[in-house]
Amino acid sequence: MAKVQGKGAAEKENDDGLREKMIAVNRVSKVVKGGRTMSFAALTVVGDGDGRIGMGKGKAREVPVSVQKAMEQARRGMFKVALKNGTLHHTVVGKHGASTVLISPAAEGTGVIAGGPMRAIFEVMGVRNVVAKSLGSSNPYNMVRATLNGLRASLTPSEVAAKRGKTVEEILG
């Protein structure tokens, strides 16, 4: 069973300006001839507070080492999400496995209305106003992947206009 971090999730800000958050730590075991070998699997997210986000998972015999591996992987896999005044441009749906997440932009002052791992993602990437709903599986790994898939699918009005061969004014009405 994963130990999911709630409101008191371990968040650190490094000297490189990146925010790190640990989402879950799982104790896993491998059965070998001499018995069981215990190790720990960690799931983390890293963001810059300005729309860049990355997810990492690491596994090691000790918790700190697995968390460090996960943070390094998250830093290597960061990508940029276009934000508009601390929220998204439009509603997106993300899916991974049995998890589906619905992420909607929100008006200024709404705050981050999201549960579990989704809240950690929005906090480290600098989203201030968003409403997100998790549907299906609540497995932390699947929820994080579904959220990131949804964020990757979000487009700016200029990207939508370029895709349709129109101007931004025509798209926005």
Curated annotation (Swiss-Prot):
Belongs to the universal ribosomal protein uS5 family. Residues 18-81 form the S5 DRBM domain. InterPro entries: Ribosomal_Su5_D2-typ_SF, Ribosomal_uS5, Ribosomal_uS5_bac-type, Ribosomal_uS5_C, Ribosomal_uS5_N, Ribosomal_uS5_N_CS, Ribsml_uS5_D2-typ_fold_subgr. Keywords: Ribonucleoprotein, Ribosomal protein, RNA-binding, rRNA-binding. One of its GO terms (molecular function) is rRNA binding. HAMAP family: Ribosomal_uS5_B (MF_01307_B). Pfam families: Ribosomal_S5, Ribosomal_S5_C. GO terms for biological process: translation. The N-terminal domain interacts with the head of the 30S subunit; the C-terminal domain interacts with the body and contacts protein S4. The interaction surface between S4 and S5 is involved in control of translational fidelity. It comes from Bordetella petrii (strain ATCC BAA-461 / DSM 12804 / CCUG 43448). This is Small ribosomal subunit protein uS5. With S4 and S12 plays an important role in translational accuracy. It comes from the Bacteria. Part of the 30S ribosomal subunit. Contacts proteins S4 and S8. PANTHER family: MITOCHONDRIAL RIBOSOMAL PROTEIN S5 (PTHR48277:SF1). SUPFAM superfamilies: dsRNA-binding domain-like, Ribosomal protein S5 domain 2-like. The keyword rRNA-binding applies. One of its GO terms (cellular component) is small ribosomal subunit.
